[in-house]
Amino acid sequence: MARFGAVIHRVFLPLLLLLVVLGACHVTPAAAAAGARLSALAKALVVEASPRAGQVLHAGEDAITVTWSLNATAAAAAAGADAGYKAVKVTLCYAPASQVGRGWRKAHDDLSKDKACQFKIAQQPYDGAGKFEYTVARDVPTASYYVRAYALDASGARVAYGETAPSASFAVAGITGVTASIEVAAGVLSAFSVAALAVFLVLENKKKNK
């Protein structure tokens, strides 16, 4: 029995300690995301979007031209400061006015809890500056929006950001679910129903007269 206890002590105890150490050192992606805060990121990107403040765009139809570049006046623009930037991810974010009373759209400093920037516009390799056109997706709901871009490192973690002014937001008119084609189809069916009813009444009237 004593010998068995010694084996347990020599083999399993070190293994248990190793597992504990590995568990303590391991950081899950969720935990890493929870540690990312917007207030801790350098505002190192300049982001511009083509819509004017207050302009209304239509989901599934209108396009936005987005440009981004390294902020030349920021401390992050020092030589080589952006060496760790590997990609830029651009998102469409609910403006403050469209967050009021809607917890599912609420902005949060802890980016793992942020619900304002739900719509991914694009992601492209970091090259100091970029420009692209985005057609507003059909599933973007009616609301006011602004654009935010994140600089990502090699692991995909957000390390810097930039955004258009939330106060100069533009609007998107979402698709209500009743499209023009549906309205046309409904009109055709309605006309067909009236015509069919008229034919039926005429035939019934002829039968009675016989």
Curated annotation (Swiss-Prot):
Pfam families: NAR2. The chain crosses the membrane at residues 182-202. GO terms for cellular component: plasma membrane. The keyword Ribonucleoprotein does not apply. InterPro entries: Transptr_NO3_Nar2 (IPR016605). Residues 1-23 form the signal peptide. The keyword Transferase does not apply. It is a single-pass membrane protein. Induction: Not induced by nitrate in roots. One of its GO terms (biological process) is response to nitrate. Involved in nitrate transport. This is Probable high-affinity nitrate transporter-activating protein 2.2. It comes from Oryza sativa subsp. japonica.
